[in-house]
Amino acid sequence: MNGNKLVFLPKKSYHQLFNITFSAMMLALAIITSLISEFISIPFFSQLKLTFDISVVFLVACAFFVSLGWSLTITLASALTSFFWNTNNVIGVLTVTLANLSTILFTRLYFCLFSKRRFCWIFVFLFTTLSNALLLTTLNGILITPLFWYYFGYVQTPNFLIVAEQYNKNTDFHFFFFGINNYWLGIFCLYSFFNLVKFGLVSCFGVPIMRSFQKFYWKRALAK
């Protein structure tokens, strides 16, 4: 092992059993965690269909200790499974899936940058949290919130420019964003706070989990 540099499993036949077993285990844990999060009701956020789902931690583990391909596969499998208990919240499932994919890619990117640092995983998850908060807050303003409101019939168009204009004029919408009367300020305040808290929780679980997996599975991940 060279410092904190992670060596991925080589694509050899005798590693296939480990790949399948570990991926299946991570998928099962991700599904269970995602399901549990649906029963955790937090005032205000639950009314907006926002859940603090931290199942992505296990998808990230698969990306590092098996492969990116396997991780993307179980991410899609987890998303499809979520439709069983989220049949009326298609946009919510797609949003969580998008957040999971961005988390996987950001952790891979920042691991390449910080792999030689002493507290590697802390830096990886810290910058992933900040990047996700910025990306998803922006997407919520431009795409996700307009689609969500259009899907449930709150607005007549998913065009974010028109939605922002209607929000600013109609005080009935202000409930969604802490009573703030400006669409973009409301988007920033709500979703930056939500995403920082959510991915902060992901980091709190992700750092010790990744360090534990790194410790106990390292020998199996070394390419000899």
UniProtKB/Swiss-Prot annotation:
Membrane topology per the record? Answer: Multi-pass membrane protein
Presence of keyword Cell membrane: yes
Q: Does the keyword Nucleotide-binding apply?
A: no
> Entry's Gene3D superfamilies?
1.10.1760.20
List the keywords (alphabetical).
Cell membrane, Membrane, Transmembrane, Transmembrane helix
GO CC terms in record: plasma membrane
Q: Which residues form a coiled coil?
A: none
- Protein's cellular compartments: Cell membrane
Membrane-crossing residue ranges in chain numbering: 25-45, 54-74, 91-111, 119-139, 142-162, 174-194
Q: Which NCBIfam families match?
A: memb_MPN527
What is the name of the protein in this document? Answer: Uncharacterized protein MG350.1
Provide the species name. Answer: Mycoplasma genitalium (strain ATCC 33530 / DSM 19775 / NCTC 10195 / G37)
